[in-house]
C-alpha cells in the first residue's frame, strides 16, 4: 500500500472530535483524491504537512517559537518523497529539537494513528504564494526531555510548558482541541 492509499484509509477511518475537524478530514480526503497532495509545489489549495506534539513524563508539551511565523507551535513540516506523515512528523521533531527518543503512545511502531487534523493558512514567503497546509498531527512521548537542542534556523526558542501554559501560548481553537484531547487521553 502506498502512502496515498494508507493515508486515505486512515483518514476515512478517523473519527473527528468536532465539526471543524470533520470539515478538515473531508477536505483532506478530497485533496488526496484529486492532486499530488504531498508535493511542496502544489499550492492550490495546498499540500499535506505533518506535525507532532511532544509530551514528557511530567505531562508537559515541547513547543517552539517559530522564527518565520513568530508564533509558538508544535514542531512539524513537509512530508518528503516516499515518507509517510507519521515518519515525517518524527523526523521534523528530531531535526528541530534534537530529540531522538520519541515514541508514539500504544506501541513501538511508527504507524500508530492520527491524533488530530487541521488546515491552516500559510502566508507568502520564501518564493511561495499564500497557501494552506493540510496538517496531519500526531502525539509522541520522550523520556529524555533534557536532550533538546534548538535549531536556530527554525526556532527562536524551545520550551517545555504545562498544558495550561500551552493553551495561553497557542490560543486558537485548533490548539485548544489538541490540548483537550491530550488531557483526556493522558497519560502518554
Regions found by a protein language model. Give the residues of each.
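Generic N-terminal amphipathic, Lys/Arg-enriched alpha-helix
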Residues: 4-15
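Short connector loops at helix/strand junctions that flank enzyme active sites
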Residues: 45-49, 67-69, 74, 131-135
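Glycine-rich active-site/cofactor-binding loop and its immediate structural neighborhood
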Residues: 55-57, 61-91
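Unchanged
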Residues: 80-174
Amino acid at each position: 500500500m502506498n502512502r496515498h492509499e494508507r493515508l486515505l484509509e486512515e483518514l476515512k477511518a478517523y473519527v473527528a472530535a468536532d465539526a471543524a475537524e470533520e470539515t478538515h478530514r473531508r477536505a483532506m480526503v478530497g485533496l488526496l483524491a484529486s492532486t499530488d497532495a504531498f508535493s511542496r509545489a502544489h499550492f492550490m489549495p495546498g499540500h499535506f504537512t505533518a506535525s507532532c506534539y511532544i509530551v514528557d513524563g511530567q505531562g508537559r508539551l515541547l513547543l517552539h517559537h517559530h522564527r518565520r511565523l513568530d508564533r509558538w507551535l508544535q514542531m512539524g513540516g513537509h512530508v518528503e518523497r516516499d515518507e509517510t506523515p507519521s515518519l515525517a512528523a518524527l523526523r521534523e521533531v528530531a531535526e528541530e529539537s534534537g530529540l531522538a527518543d520519541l515514541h508514539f503512545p500504544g506501541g513501538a511502531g511508527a504507524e500508530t494513528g492520527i491524533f488530530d487534523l487541521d488546515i491552516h493558512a500559510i502566508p507568502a514567503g520564501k518564493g511561495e504564494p499564500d497557501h494552506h497546509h493540510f496538517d496531519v498531527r500526531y502525539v509522541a512521548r520522550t523520556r529524555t526531555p533534557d536532550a533538546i537542542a534548538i535549531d536556530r534556523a527554525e526556532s527562536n526558542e524551545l520550551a517545555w510548558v504545562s498544558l495550561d501554559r500551552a493553551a495561553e501560548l497557542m490560543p486558537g481553537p485548533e490548539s485548544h482541541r489538541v490540548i483537550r484531547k491530550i488531557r483526556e487521553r493522558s497519560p502518554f
